[in-house]
């Protein structure tokens, strides 16, 4: 493999006769407060080849079933390597995902060089997280990565490719490429199609487009205030903690390897899909919060008191949010926000509120309707904190000029539109 930060890979897929439903399953960090979703998925996948059998839904992290599931995952990976993953693509996979609104999201699946990525605060590598990485979330995920012989990605990267040089040219010639899969995804995930990109000339074109995005002079023209900084080529759009876990595992493995092994070991790379942030099919959605164990009236009073304690702002604030529970909804305007984005101010409030209220917990929810539903039971006090829309134009600007955004700031699309596990790659030797 080349030293590019994103490159062609040996990608594995099941035989052509294996249907996407139930082979492909949604990212494990979705529907964490809705175990019934995962029960339905398991029913659909029972006794059939499915990536659900080689991943650990976060709904099961820390449960008595965790150890048994991890053992089952490792056994199933070995079975799939021998008898299920019978097709190999050496190159990229061009994908098209038809979303709930009918738009088609284009992407390229390849391998991220983990030596070109870092989640450490203040680092400026070619590949950067768009949000803060909560390092405490990595160890539970490392349990899955350690000892695994396969990986299957739900990581989605974003390229700042205003001229559409990287992905879109492949889409124009997709009918000339070998088709790989074409079908519906389980539980309302939409339609997914994929084509193999193995022609050396096409791979060279993709690599050249990536090299142009990494050009220091072009980066300095785009971001004059960041002149002299290493160019940022890709930002992590989704799956930040999955990529961070792959990085942590690679750093853990490195000291056990020779210099030659470090250059070629498959765990140095992580499969991911790259999309163009400028695509009209890429929607950046706010991630809402649901606070369990407290009603909206009580939370409103606490938030109002906390806001007043922040001191007097010298400028007019435009930070707005909504609080909702089973009894209704109210609008909130923050007068003295301590952070530049509403989500940052909310996180600062929760950082003070939660330790002072034992038994109150928070979950991060994709989709306003889901957040409202979770806070709608009068018998179980809960409040949905509904955040305003997030402008995707601010994403690269915020990361390049200001560092990472607050954790759980945004999500790319609705929960059902997350990347499904599909392609696989060997990471063990």
Regions found by a protein language model. Give the residues of each.
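Charged substrate- and nucleic-acid-binding regions of tRNA-handling and nucleotidyl-transfer enzymes
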Residues: 344-429
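Short beta-strand segments
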Residues: 158, 236-237, 273, 386-387
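N-terminal extension/subdomain marker
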Residues: 1-190, 194, 198, 221-224, ...
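Metal-assisted phosphate- and nucleotidyl-transfer catalytic regions
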Residues: 223, 308-323, 361-364, 377-378, ...
């Amino acid at each position: 493999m080349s030293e590019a930060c994103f490159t062609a890979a040996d990608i594995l897929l099941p035989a052509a006769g294996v249907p996407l439903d139930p082979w492909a399953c949604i990212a494990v960090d979705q529907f964490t407060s809705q175990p019934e979703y995962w029960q339905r998925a398991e029913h659909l996948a029972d006794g059939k080849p499915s990536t659900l059998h080689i991943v650990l839904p976060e709904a099961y992290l820390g449960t008595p079933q965790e150890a048994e599931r991890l053992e089952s995952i490792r056994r199933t990976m070995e079975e799939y390597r021998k008898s299920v993953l019978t097709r190999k693509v050496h190159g990229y996979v061009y994908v098209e995902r038809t979303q709930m609104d009918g738009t088609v999201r284009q992407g390229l699946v390849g391998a991220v060089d983990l030596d070109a990525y870092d989640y450490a605060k203040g680092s400026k590598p070619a590949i950067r997280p768009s949000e803060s990485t909560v390092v405490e979330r990595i160890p539970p995920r490392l349990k899955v990565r350690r000892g695994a012989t396969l990986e299957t990605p739900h990581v989605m990267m974003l390229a700042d490719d205003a001229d559409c040089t990287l992905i879109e040219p492949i889409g124009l010639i997709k009918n000339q490429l070998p088709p790989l899969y074409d079908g519906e995804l389980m539980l309302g995930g939409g339609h997914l199609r994929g084509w193999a990109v193995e022609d050396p000339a096409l791979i060279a074109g993709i690599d050249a487009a990536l090299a142009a995005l990494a050009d220091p002079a072009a980066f300095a023209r785009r971001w004059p205030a960041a002149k002299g900084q290493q160019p940022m080529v890709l930002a992590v759009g989704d799956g930040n903690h999955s990529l961070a876990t792959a990085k942590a595992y690679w750093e853990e493995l490195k000291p056990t390897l020779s210099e030659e092994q470090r250059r070629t070991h498959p765990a140095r790379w992580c499969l991911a899909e790259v999309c163009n942030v400028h695509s009209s099919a890429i929607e950046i959605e706010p991630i809402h919060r649901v606070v369990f164990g407290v009603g909206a009236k009580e939370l409103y009073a606490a938030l109002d008191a906390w806001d007043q304690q922040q001191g007097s702002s010298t400028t007019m604030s435009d930070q707005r949010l909504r609080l909702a529970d089973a009894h209704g909804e109210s609008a909130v305007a923050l007068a003295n926000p301590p952070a530049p984005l509403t989500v940052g101010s909310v996180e600062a409030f929760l950082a003070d509120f939660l330790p002072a209220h034992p038994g109150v917990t928070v979950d991060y929810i994709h989709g306003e309707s889901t957040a409202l539903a979770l806070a709608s039971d009068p018998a179980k006090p809960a409040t949905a904190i509904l955040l305003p829309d997030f402008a995707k134009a601010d994403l690269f600007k915020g990361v390049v000029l200001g560092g990472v955004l607050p954790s759980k700031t945004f999500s790319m699309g609705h929960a059902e539109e997350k990347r499904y596990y599909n392609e696989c790659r060997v990471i063990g030797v």
